[in-house]
């Protein structure tokens, strides 16, 4: 109902009191959680602050139980989030680019910051939600289904120093999508 409520955070659980009415099974609702802090250490996975060629690099790897180390979620691989919005603010200098799941909804420049809004509209298990931040080289392509003529945007994000070595490999993406489309529909 758009109201701020209380919560209890113990261990890896956030408990939000239910309203005083019965919520029917299958009822869809959303919760907006403002989250900040230092991500919990999760071994080789989780939320990572790194450098590449002396430039800051942020990335995530959440498989299989490390999503909760960097964002509030039901971290259970057998369950899926209906959809996910990822909104990230980064400095404009260097020219950081945020890559994430789904489709980029917007990128807004505000002073010396950029705000990226990505949205995944399909059910996704929480450990597959990811983000990567770096001044990447980005290029775009498009897959066109031979069966339906449906199109799908393809976006490639790569470290600039690895572009030449990786470009020819990324050109295989459309052939791979064709194969997977033939095999799985």
Which residues are covered by each model-predicted region?
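Short secondary-structure boundary micro-motifs
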Residues: 53-55, 70-73, 153-154
């Amino acid at each position: 109902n758009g109201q701020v409520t209380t919560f209890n955070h113990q261990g890896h659980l956030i408990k939000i009191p239910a309203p005083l009415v019965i919520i029917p099974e299958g009822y869809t609702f959303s919760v907006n959680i403002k989250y900040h802090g230092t991500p919990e250490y999760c071994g080789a996975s989780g939320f990572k602050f790194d450098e590449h060629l002396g430039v800051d690099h942020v990335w995530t790897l959440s498989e299989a139980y490390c999503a909760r180390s960097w964002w509030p979620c039901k971290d259970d691989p057998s369950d899926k989030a209906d959809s996910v919005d990822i909104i990230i603010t980064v400095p404009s200098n260097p020219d950081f680019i945020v890559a994430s799941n789904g489709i980029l909804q917007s990128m807004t420049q505000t002073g010396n910051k950029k705000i990226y809004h990505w949205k995944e509209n399909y059910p996704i298990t929480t450990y597959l939600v990811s983000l990567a931040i770096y001044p990447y080289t980005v290029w775009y392509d498009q897959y066109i289904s031979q069966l339906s003529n449906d199109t799908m945007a393809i976006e490639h994000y790569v470290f600039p120093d690895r572009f030449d070595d990786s470009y020819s490999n990324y050109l295989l993406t459309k052939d791979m999508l064709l194969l997977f489309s033939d095999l799985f529909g």
